Amino acid sequence: MKQLKIFKIILIICFISIIPTAFAQKGTYVDEIKFIQYLDENTALEEVKNGNLDMYYYRISSDRLEDSESRDRLKVYESTGGYYSILLNPTDEGPFNPFSIQEVRYAVNFLVDRNLIVNELLGGYGTPMFSNYGSFSAEYLRVLDVIETFQFRYNPSFAENVISEELSAKGAEKIDGVWNYENEPIEITFFIRSDDPVRKAIGEILSSELEEIGFKVNKEFGDLNKAYVVVY
């Protein structure tokens, strides 16, 4: 399985200069807007706190908002800034790939504890997603009735039963707690983004769940640039 949680990072700072003098009736409140790119989030936040920048226009990780001290001299606006996703490789070419089986891909939904991710990893700053349309999407209501029929929730026992049934039907055997196909352990290559603590944690958690099921998981770590090369 190859994994990539897609979220391109662009850090932009907006600096606004207020006109101190009179202006025409149809004039603007500013005479200049500067956009400055910061690659270091810590530097950008300190610049805002010190009054050198008026706005930091990008998401802030939840661990930086845990207490009143971290919010000091900051006014935080909540918005939908992106999402975390897990991509499964469905190819049936090459070595045996359990994710080429639709029912196995379906079962993975029950190995993901979305509430844990939202509450623990994101500090409550998020909502669980069960499709490519989130609850804030205008299209969400169109697919809501379909999503509800799947009853996706964290249920590893159900996932294991589905996966075991499908693998057994393909001739795989579980030997000493490890799934084997044609006398070879079934291996999964899992690419995990290590340049983001949330993505890294999600990858580690799901890897453990897959190992509990009986797969041999080879974890490969890397940043977004490596993901583009390795995954795509």
Tell me the role of every PLM-derived stretch.
Residues Q25-D31, Q102, P156, E160-T189:
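Immediate post-signal peptide segment of exported/extracytoplasmic ligand-binding proteins
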Residues I9-I18:
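Bacterial N-terminal signal peptides
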Residues G81-A107, L111, E120-L121, R193:
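A bilobed periplasmic-binding-protein/Venus flytrap-type ligand-binding module shared by bacterial periplasmic
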Residues E47-V48, L53-Y57, L65, E211-Y232:
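Periplasmic binding protein-like
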Residues K5, P20-D40, D67-G82, K174-D176:
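Aromatic-rich, solvent-exposed beta-strand/loop patch
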Residues P128-K174, S194-K200:
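Structural transition elements
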Residues V30-Q37, A44, M55, P185-R193, ...:
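Short, well-ordered beta-strand elements
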Residues A44-L45, P95, V104-R105, K226-V231:
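Short, hydrophobic alpha-helical packing/hinge segments within bilobed ligand-binding/sensory domains
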